[in-house]
């Protein structure tokens, strides 16, 4: 069984969250060729919508999610600022997700700080390994 996160999966997640009535958040998706490229999250504060988060999505040639970038709204500068980035890599038995945090001093994403590996080991059984970077040097298994 091939595990992939496609453009359709991202669109479904958006539509499910956008139709939920149980929160004070509103969602605006910008779509291109049937794919969600940007998802903005706004909060209803005293009947005024304020920007909170923005997600940007990049897909590979097979329409699989390859990058999800999260940005936070800076009220002082009135701009979206990078927070973290998730990079997706696919294999026959599953996929991995690597996270890199934004380094404001260097104005770029840093090294991978966390990684999750998802692999099908049996029919309907998925193994998940969670790694964290230790002292900025090596990835250490934290849970599985």
Residue ranges and their predicted role:
Residues 1-9:
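Sec-dependent signal peptide recognition
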Residues 14-144:
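Buried hydrophobic residues that stabilize the cores of well-folded domains
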């Amino acid at each position: 069984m091939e595990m992939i996160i496609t453009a359709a999966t991202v669109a479904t997640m958006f539509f499910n969250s956008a139709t939920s009535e149980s929160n004070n958040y509103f969602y605006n998706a910008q779509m291109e060729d049937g794919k969600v490229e940007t998802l903005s999250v706004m909060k209803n504060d005293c009947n005024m919508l304020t920007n909170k988060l923005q997600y940007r999505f990049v897909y590979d040639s097979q329409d699989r999610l390859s990058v999800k970038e999260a940005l936070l709204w800076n009220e002082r500068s009135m701009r979206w600022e990078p927070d973290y980035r998730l990079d997706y890599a696919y294999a026959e038995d599953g996929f991995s997700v690597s996270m890199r945090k934004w380094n404001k001093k260097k104005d770029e994403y840093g090294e991978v700080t966390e990684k999750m590996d998802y692999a099908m080991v049996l029919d309907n059984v998925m193994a998940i390994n969670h790694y964290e970077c230790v002292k900025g040097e090596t990835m250490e298994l934290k849970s599985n």
